[in-house]
Amino acid sequence: MATKVKENEEAENERDGATDGPLLDLSDDAVKKMIKAAKKRGYVTMDELNSVLPSEEVTSEQIEDTMAMLSDMGINVIEDEDAEEAAPAEDDGDSDNEESEGGELAPSGGTALATAKKKEPTDRTDDPVRMYLREMGSVELLSREGEIAIAKRIEAGRETMISGLCESPLTFQALIIWRDELNEGTTLLREIIDLETTYSGPEAKAAPQFQSPEKIEADRKAAEEKEKTRRLRAPTGDEDVTDVGGDGLPPEEEEEDDDESNLSLAAMEAELRPQVMETLDTIADTYKKLRKLQDQQVEARLACTGTLSSGQERRYKELKDQLITAVKSLSLNQNRIDSLVEQLYDISKRLMQNEGRLLRLAESYGVKRDSFLEQYHGAELDPNWMKSITNLAARGWKEFAREESNTIREIRQEIQNLSTETGISIAEFRRIVSMVQKGEREARIAKKEMVEANLRLVISIAKKYTNRGLQFLDLIQEGNIGLMKAVDKFEYRRGYKFSTYATWWIRQAITRSIADQARTIRIPVHMIETINKIVRTSRQMLHEIGREPTPEELAEKLAMPLEKVRKVLKIAKEPISLETPVGDEEDSHLGDFIEDKNALLPIDAAIQANLRETTTRVLASLTPREERVLRMRFGIGMNTDHTLEEVGQQFSVTRERIRQIEAKALRKLKHPSRSRKLRSFLDS
């Protein structure tokens, strides 16, 4: 295998136009036997693989696709059987679970594709797809245990971030505002809390012992049976938008589940509202008590009278713990958490700007950075800080305090206002911000690892949706967006592999983007579903009757009104650009061959031009007054014709005189010397 890869890489540089077809013929008995044995063992040796590969030269892309296909099946490619002894085999129980709709196999643990990537040539390439695939191949796939470990890190990071938010008085202030909005009816409960998580209670987030291994295995088998049953009922053919729902259900079942979901949300909201309102009221009452102690603490630090008494400190800690417990029990909506984090970061940014301004001012007088930080930290709210720095003997301090006293007081007043706004000391605020940033950073890093390890899954799904109006890179991008949503929603305690769960999110993201972006004139998703249903049925009937079905036959087959079928078929037609090149030389466009109903035929245009020229010559043979009267009466060379009265006003004569001039001019035109020139136009 290694020799074949090297030979094919050299051959690839000589012929760029090689075709990329599948290397393994899955209908061949030898290939079937090899794959069956490899699935049972979890690996295949290179010698075994070489024995079933075709003898003709192939491209490195074909070998890469073959390695990826085997990896998707859960088969590792190794040099020899001795190398497999060090690597644990995949659990057989996950192999069925990895299979998704349409017979597609989702990636599982293994490093086959990463091994294949190492065998690729290291020459530079400008192709963005190849660069993306090469970078993607450097990340190893995750096993089930690896997915659980990363999911736990995401959960721990989120827990750290929420714990930090729960210690911020800004969170309690926001909760009180949200409670008032709920009472006023301006906000829905589902916009503030995560209904499903709050409804399921602590058991939903508890340790795995709340779900026994037997329960997890039973759920997994039930899901597999449901998937197999659905796949048997599904029609054959390409996958369409109608095949993919939010939960991987057929359209009919998905619609029913959507109704049930909407009903359940309303029911959960009605059931949880009293409990949530009671919790919010408790938070409001407890926070009022805590706020009094916080104000006393800040005032004590500003007045340099020390801190709270031991009893007050103990009471402060008790109230704080009660608030944190109450807030965590709410399971806030992610959008609300993001708004709280953004508010916290905004105040932190303003604090850093003021402190940075003060530091730069001190450094301009020669104060060393370390010396400034030593004197400043811990004394942010000390009203006697100006006096203390004036007495310092270190370089620059006295000049700094003397020359910039007004600016220093102004900056420190702004910092004090921020402390009052947050309700806690600056040091405590910094600790909370650091805690939130740490949790957010850990969760983000873990999510990034999970996403990068499953990029192959997006590629394998996106390949099925090419030639549908979007570029391959656009499909990958939309699939990656779905993958990131799947990472956010993944619940590892349910016992399923991440690939099984993420497949539906990726497919829905891709199919929805095709429906929204692929057409020049956007068609609603529900109409796209109807179009795909008719197209699929038409393709099926084509195989049955040997010709394209008529609209009447489609309407009868689908039990649809004939007018609706005709309307859908009309909408389904793709628009084509009038600038489409025509011919080999591409010197003309499609629009050049479309008849313009409003344009004159060339012969008619020539006749009209000749008539205009002849009429002008004939009229010129009359007197100027007669010519002008005829032109005005018949609108020749003018925007409109004129009445006898209007012409008379122009010449300051009566209408009767104009009638006489007109009659005389017409008699002159009827003379054979003039009428002969115009009679030919009348005959034509």
UniProtKB/Swiss-Prot annotation:
One of its GO terms (cellular component) is cytoplasm. It is found in: Cytoplasm. Keywords: Cytoplasm, DNA-binding, Sigma factor, Transcription, Transcription regulation. Residues 529-605 are annotated as: Sigma-70 factor domain-3. Residues 1-25, 83-129, 203-262 are annotated as: Disordered. Residues 1-18, 117-129, 214-228 have a biased composition (Basic and acidic residues). Gene3D superfamilies: RNA Polymerase Primary Sigma Factor, Sigma-70 factor, region 1.1, Winged helix-like DNA-binding domain superfamily/Winged helix DNA-binding domain. A motif (Interaction with polymerase core subunit RpoC) lies at residues 474-477. GO terms for molecular function: DNA binding; sigma factor activity. InterPro entries: RNA_pol_sigma-70_dom, RNA_pol_sigma70, RNA_pol_sigma70_r1_2, RNA_pol_sigma70_r2, RNA_pol_sigma70_r3, RNA_pol_sigma70_r4, RNA_pol_sigma_70_non-ess, RNA_pol_sigma_70_r1_1. Residues 83-102, 250-261 have a biased composition (Acidic residues). It comes from the Bacteria. Residues 450-520 are annotated as: Sigma-70 factor domain-2. Residues 618-671 are annotated as: Sigma-70 factor domain-4. Disulfide bonds: none annotated. GO terms for biological process: DNA-templated transcription initiation. Residues 644-663 bind DNA. SUPFAM superfamilies: Sigma2 domain of RNA polymerase sigma factors, Sigma3 and sigma4 domains of RNA polymerase sigma factors. Interacts transiently with the RNA polymerase catalytic core. Belongs to the sigma-70 factor family. RpoD/SigA subfamily. Sigma factors are initiation factors that promote the attachment of RNA polymerase to specific initiation sites and are then released. This sigma factor is the primary sigma factor during exponential growth. This is RNA polymerase sigma factor RpoD.
